[in-house]
Structures are given as structure tokens and as C-alpha cells.
Amino acid sequence: MWQSKGPPRVAFFSWLASLGKVLTTDNLCKRCIIVLDWCYMCKRCGESVDHLLLHCPVAFELWSLVFCLFGLHWVMPHKVIELFGRHRNIDFWRLVLHCLMWCIWSAINARYFKGFERSLLEIKSFFVHTLLVWSVALSHFSCFSLSVLLDHCNFVS
């Protein structure tokens, strides 16, 4: 997890998420902070780290995009920590995991703190754009091209 080539604050966020310590509504309730216990993304279930980043219908759509890009058929793990045990040796895959979780977290914070609700298409676009920008910044690719990113996704799988 710490060997990610992504931004350090994203690696820190992923570490907190893997420990279940991100301030979701269930964790805020444990600290006696009174909030509505519902997911701000799907507006249904109680919000836990695992629900928000893995099992929420909105997160599931984003994971489906990743699986489609990589040509993967994968059973979703129950806990965030289980994500980081898979594909350990592929830096780009780790970057994808960090980027997707960061984009979900950014979308939830935009809804919660700014009242700005991104559509699913906007969140998907934000994810692909962020992944491309991070990949170029980290020298995974020499050119800024979506087609190069998509080719690399197919190569990694």
C-alpha cells in the first residue's frame, strides 16, 4: 500500500481506509457525533468504509468500469484491506486502486461539504482523468493520451 506511486496523501487515505478509520458516518457515530446514518452516495444504506468504497451501488459502477478497462472478472472483497493483497507487484494496478478510492472519497466530500453532487458519469470521467494525470506525472506514460492509458490497462491485465 505504501509503495504506491500516487500522491502521499492518497496513500495515507488508503491506509486509513484499509484500517476502517476513515470518518464515515458509522465512525462518526462511534465518536458520539450525531449524523444521519446513510450513505451520501447511494442515499440508502448506512455508510461504512467498506460500503462506501466497495459495496455502494455507485462505487460498484466505478469498480465495474475498472474491471471492464482491465478485462477482469473479479469477486469484490468484503473489506478494503483485502484489495491491497491482490496484484501486489504491479505498480500501475496499485495506482488504480488508490485513484479510484480517492475519487470516490472526493465525490462524497463534495456532496457532504459543498452540496455539489456529481453524476455517475462525472465521477467516472473524474476518475479516468485523474488516473491519466497521475500516470503522466509519475512517468508511467510519455504522452498525455487516453488511448495510451486504455492500451496500458489491457496490457496490465
Name each model feature, range by range:
Residues M1-G46, F155-S157:
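Helix/loop segments that flank and initiate small ligand/metal-binding modules
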Residues C29, V35-S157:
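Family-specific functional microsites
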